[in-house]
Amino acid sequence: LSSFPEFGPGGPPLLVPSDPGSQRGITALDRLPIVDFHKIGILYAAPGQRSEQEILSNTHGSKAYIEFISSLGHLVRLKGSRELDIYAGGLDQENDIDGRWTYLWDDDIAQIVFHVATLMPTSPETDPQATLKKRHIGNDFVKVVFNDSGAEFAFDTLPGDFNFVNIIIQPHTPAGNPWSGPGMTNNAEFFKVSMQCRTGMPEVGPLGAFKMVTGSSLPAFVRQLSLHSNIFAQIYLASVGFEARQGTQKLEYSSNWRKRLQQIKLLKSRILQAQGTALVNSAAAPLDLDAAEASRMFTAWL
């Protein structure tokens, strides 16, 4: 544990009282996740497909598409995943309503669930418009489209209030004699990666017009790009908002880490008030490394 950013002497740790108010504060803190959650839509457009219904109705994709999604993260069984503290982004975790499997990626500070359209149930008889798929993917701020259609993918193919960023992947391996150059092998596959943004949104990420990416680097590159785009879309919503039927709507953006910090500060403030201690704003003391190190030794106060 670190005392950053409070390097200076801050006094002994505060004992949390056992009164109902303080215990409710601890309970509220326990309910806040320790990582940030993200959900990204994944679509496959087969040759000749252009409409929303055609694309959402796909149950499989090309070999390159399968290799791509299988390297985005690890495959997880949805049923029973709630007990493993897995974030499913709204996918059913009990009755396989939204499919049996999905892909998940996580590290120490974030967790991404991918809403993969080809892994969700397709029912042409009972759900010809694939509304069960769209209720999830249509609410994702960022969608990744593996475009094998042979045509340009229109931004509003899946229209919706939360359609902010589309990341388009197109197979682009040169025909005939492959490119030659440093790092390029004769059996390398290449993909053109481009981005579409909602009107009014500034450009985000390193793409520019587009980037050519090898197949081996594609999953990690697109995953990182979609993560940054999803964070940016949330900040954009908080600062600018979006036009809806009710007028301009704004959604506050706050990371789970920030929410936990706010809850800790609130709990600390209540404890100090209960002890009759006034909070006094004072100028920051010069950094004392010895004192900073000593402040990390919590056992010294026991």
Put a short name on every predicted segment.
Residues 1-302:
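Long, non-globular regulatory segments flanking folded domains
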